[in-house]
């Protein structure tokens, strides 16, 4: 089984959009800390909405994960796109896990929503951001798709709770009888987002003329050498 050279991690870490992730993560933690600073007047609904807003904030920063000013240079290297994406995701995953744990712990336990269920929501929002970035890279030539992806993510995050049909029941509260069904839907969305991201991590094959395929490295057809 082929393994990834650990030497690839160092340049990946250097080119990660840590400023965007750090700024978004800081904003998310400030939001998560709000219920604890408000005293006894906080209820579970407010705490849940704050955690949802925190998850969206972090996802907006993660939308910049695949921004790479050198994309047009690295597209021709032997390392496949799936590996390059995977390395960036590998760098982000422990940061995201630690950040979300801190966000949950900042919310007072008395009003904290069920951790497992709200984590599914947060993971789905993050997966949507990452799959959106992967789709933008797969379908476009831009080196910095993060800003556009973040904009597309922010719009449904704000309008979704207001415009979503009641039958979808995504944005429910723990005391709602539809809470379990809602998180079944969140899980389906999560799986769909992961599937889209996996498909978009594949190298595109561009068709040139009739019946000729060109690979990202610039070769077409079998070698005549």
Where are these predicted regions, by residue range?
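Alpha-helical transmembrane segments of integral membrane proteins, especially early/N-terminal helices
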Residues: 10-24, 50-56, 81-85, 154-155
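Secretory targeting signals
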Residues: 41-61, 87-150
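Hydrophobic alpha-helical transmembrane segments
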Residues: 1-47, 134-139, 159-225
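Juxtamembrane membrane-interface segments at transmembrane alpha-helix termini
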Residues: 60-69, 159-167
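Intrinsically disordered, low-complexity, compositionally biased regions/tails
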Residues: 114, 150, 154-155, 215, ...
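Transmembrane helix-loop junctions in multi-pass membrane proteins
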Residues: 37-38, 67, 71-73, 103-108, ...
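Helix-loop-helix units of permease transmembrane domains in multi-pass membrane transporters
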Residues: 64-91
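Central hydrophobic cores of alpha-helical transmembrane segments
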Residues: 27, 145-159
